[in-house]
């Protein structure tokens, strides 16, 4: 406790000493997560850098992962946050309840240290979730240094915690209160959907802007047959496009994306007579991946093969562009966010079948760039129909290609510069 008091005291001293030396066109982009798996925050960092801002990008960098997109930009400096020790990473609900406070304390000290050694910035740009302890630190930084903070709302922290503990758990209710009131000091709020913006405004969050995810320039359709053949070679499984259709889905292997819905749909597909063979490419990392790997070994299908690689940043968009059809299993813990994986597929000109939830229609327009279904049976029927009716599939593909024309830079440059430039 004494050490903690000393650290906090020194932190206050440093903050006060540096408060008057704020760099007006410097921004700290903070990711309390694996930077390699935070593409939207990477895109923000690159976009700020293109606008002439000096960007300090902070986040976890796990061993063997590539930080990728921003490495070569002269205006961006990446500073890794000290990673959580293995003993602070809970493996079950009971450990979560006991280790949670220690995890937050470690993050609090690590973030304070990471922020102290940075040159003062005019803005701190943070994502939510996670909101603990980030919102509190952002408030302190604003009070003591004058740094304004902007929250980029990807989802709600309390709704994700509810997946583990249940909606009525005391911790979930307390987190919702913390999230609602600690965020009110933000200079501005960004959301990934209009429905999310509407909810935040009922919470008193203003000003609030929608900044939709849009595909960056490295997610593009393949229009040259020679390039397509080169991209097909990057698929780490045996694949013959003349006899097999390629279906792709990306998942975080978490409870809000039930991969078994896809398996049930494919199991029904496997029983049909006049449908083509399928190679199902499932990308992503997460806690349920090994469990599903064992499941499909015990329950093999005849005309459906699975491939579950972890693709590099360079190979991922090229492989995605080879797909005939994409599937999105995301249902959202809050019902208010939108899946970036669909944006990536549209960027590559690939149509999508998506599970229905309240906000998905802001992105997937049923019958135009994809289809929306309610369950595994409907998913199976739509897959069967599209993969045996080329005209219908091509019509949706044209819709996806049209979506690919509106890019991240177009959306970002429309929304963000007026927010930050108006403060200087």
UniProtKB/Swiss-Prot annotation:
Residues 95-116 dip into the membrane without crossing it. Pathway: Protein modification; protein glycosylation. GO terms for molecular function: chitobiosyldiphosphodolichol beta-mannosyltransferase activity; mannosyltransferase activity. The lineage of its organism: Eukaryota, Fungi, Dikarya, Ascomycota, Taphrinomycotina. Its main location: endoplasmic reticulum. It is a single-pass membrane protein. Keywords: Endoplasmic reticulum, Glycosyltransferase, Membrane, Signal-anchor, Transferase, Transmembrane, Transmembrane helix. It is an enzyme of class 2 (transferase). Residues 20-94, 117-424 are cytoplasmic. Participates in the formation of the lipid-linked precursor oligosaccharide for N-glycosylation. Involved in assembling the dolichol-pyrophosphate-GlcNAc(2)-Man(5) intermediate on the cytoplasmic surface of the ER. It is found in: Endoplasmic reticulum membrane. Coiled coil: none annotated. Its EC number is 2.4.1.142. This is Chitobiosyldiphosphodolichol beta-mannosyltransferase.
């Amino acid at each position: 406790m004494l050490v903690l008091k000393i650290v906090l005291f020194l932190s206050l001293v440093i903050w006060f000493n540096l408060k008057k030396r704020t760099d007006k066109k410097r921004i700290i982009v903070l990711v309390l997560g694996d930077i390699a798996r935070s593409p939207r925050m990477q895109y923000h960092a690159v976009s700020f850098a293109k606008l002439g801002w000096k960007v300090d990008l902070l986040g976890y960098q796990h061993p063997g992962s590539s930080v990728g997109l921003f490495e070569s930009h002269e205006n961006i400096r990446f500073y890794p946050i000290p990673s959580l020790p293995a003993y602070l990473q809970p493996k079950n609900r009971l450990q979560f309840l006991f280790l949670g406070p220690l995890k937050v304390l470690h993050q609090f000290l690590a973030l304070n240290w990471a922020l102290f050694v940075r040159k003062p910035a005019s803005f701190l740009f943070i994502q939510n979730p996670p909101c603990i302890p980030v919102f509190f630190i952002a408030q302190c930084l604003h009070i003591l240094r004058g740094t304004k903070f902007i929250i980029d709302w990807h989802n709600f922290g309390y709704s994700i915690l509810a997946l583990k503990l249940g909606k009525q758990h005391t911790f979930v209710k307390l987190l919702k209160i913390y999230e609602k009131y600690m965020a009110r000091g933000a200079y501005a709020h960004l959301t990934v959907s209009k429905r999310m913006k509407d909810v935040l405004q009922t919470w008193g969050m203003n000003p609030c802007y929608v900044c939709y995810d849009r595909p960056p320039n490295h997610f593009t359709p393949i229009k040259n047959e020679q390039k397509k053949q080169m991209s097909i070679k990057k698929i780490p499984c045996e694949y013959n496009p003349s006899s097999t259709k390629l279906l792709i889905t990306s998942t975080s292997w978490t409870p809000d994306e039930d991969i078994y819905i896809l398996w049930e749909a494919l199991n029904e597909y496997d029983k049909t007579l006049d449908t083509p063979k399928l190679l199902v490419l499932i990308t992503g990392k997460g806690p349920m991946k090994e469990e599903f790997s064992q499941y499909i070994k015990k329950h093999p299908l005849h005309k459906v093969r699975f491939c579950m690689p972890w693709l590099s940043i360079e190979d991922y968009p090229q492989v995605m562009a080879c797909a005939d059809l994409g599937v999105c299993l995301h249902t959202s813990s809050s019902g208010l966010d939108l899946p970036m994986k669909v944006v990536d597929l549209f960027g590559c000109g690939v149509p999508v079948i998506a599970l229905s939830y309240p906000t998905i229609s802001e992105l997937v327009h049923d019958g135009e760039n994809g289809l929306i279904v309610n369950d595994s049976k409907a998913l199976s029927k739509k897959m069967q129909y599209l993969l045996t009716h080329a005209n219908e599939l091509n019509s949706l593909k044209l819709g996806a290609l049209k979506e690919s024309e509106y890019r991240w830079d177009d959306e970002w440059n429309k929304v963000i510069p007026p927010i930050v430039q108006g403060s200087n």
